[in-house]
Amino acid sequence: MSNGIVIIGSGFAARQLVKNIRKQDASIPLTLIAADSMDEYNKPDLSHVISQGQRADDLTRQTAGEFAEQFNLLLFPQTWVTDIDAEARVVKSQNNQWQYDKLVLATGASAFVPPVPGRELMLTLNSQQEYRACETQLRDARRVLIVGGGLIGSELAMDFCRAGKMVTLIDNAASILASLMPPEVSSRLQHRLTEMGVHLLLKSQLQGLEKTDSGILATLDHQRSIEVDAVIAATGLRPETALARRAGLTINRGVCVDSYLQTSNADIYALGDCAEINGQVLPFLQPIQLSAMVLAKNLLGNNTPLKLPAMLVKIKTPELPLHLAGETQRQDLRWQINTERQGMVARGVDDADQLRAFVVSEDRMKEAFGLLKTLPV
């Protein structure tokens, strides 16, 4: 490979891929191009920065220069890729272009901001860069509105509350974590958030935001409004597919790849939050780690399919942490819920009484690995 491998992106997926390639080949040319600083940080830490009083710069684990030196890479930080010429195998930015033998898209996903009037007043916390842009406003805010009661919204609501802020969480759904589990399972965390002082506005809709002399006026449905100092959008992520689309690749929700992480173009692969693997978008650390291991082998000439086991998803709400696995969002499961003072075990079974999903909390999270072994893959 005279031109080697070019990777667009510098997040967890890109870094895992680099580490796995270098374990097998110390000299193949590797080039990383990304729009950010390329410094390494742990993205899940963003859910806890406010209660821990961390600044954006405190999150940096390794600088881009240290990373390049350690793994023998060419890095191009603060560089926007504008185009991919798939036929000529060339990646282009405004001032530069790179030939590749193999190209990997690790462009991640961007935070979805609801299209309401005043949406520009909403903050997002999907990267170190985004946190850096708003850390002073968030630190100074007394009253915070979080839009979205999913995994990230619930984590942030607890964190801001632990930092002593007045927190309101709004969601269209009737319960928190509604896309992940039924209300009878999420109710334990919901009660805990309420006990802590989080004001939950469920089955409610944000209609607009407006700057005022004393903060931001949030207009809700049913002629309601509240005034806050900061509004955070936590309404989910959208895979970054614009570059792939311009390159003529097949796109659905994400960049479509097969079990080999290969796109509709034989020399282009996708990995991480931007990828849709056989119809599934899996924006969690474990599938990305496993995907990176397989893709490294395939880029170096192997033909290894990705086989994902049953995997745990961790909800980082320290006052009431949860682990879940399996098809927790399935509507047809019967839930058997065992609740004790020290925690909960909720098992979702199908009509044949086969375990299909589970959620465990607090001290009973230690039962997760035993349950995981009994889930069908």
UniProtKB/Swiss-Prot annotation:
Pathway info: Nitrogen metabolism; nitric oxide reduction
InterPro entries: FAD-bd_OxRdtase, FAD/NAD-bd_sf, FAD/NAD-binding_dom, NO_rdtase_NorW, Rbx-bd
Subcellular compartments: Cytoplasm
Keyword Membrane: no
UniProt catalytic activity: 2 reduced [nitric oxide reductase rubredoxin domain] + NAD(+) + H(+) = 2 oxidized [nitric oxide reductase rubredoxin domain] + NADH
Keywords on record: Cytoplasm, FAD, Flavoprotein, NAD, Oxidoreductase
Cofactor(s) for this UniProt protein: FAD
PANTHER family for this protein: NITRITE REDUCTASE [NAD(P)H], PYRIDINE NUCLEOTIDE-DISULFIDE OXIDOREDUCTASE DOMAIN-CONTAINING
Listed name of the protein: Nitric oxide reductase FlRd-NAD(+) reductase
Native organism: Escherichia coli O157:H7
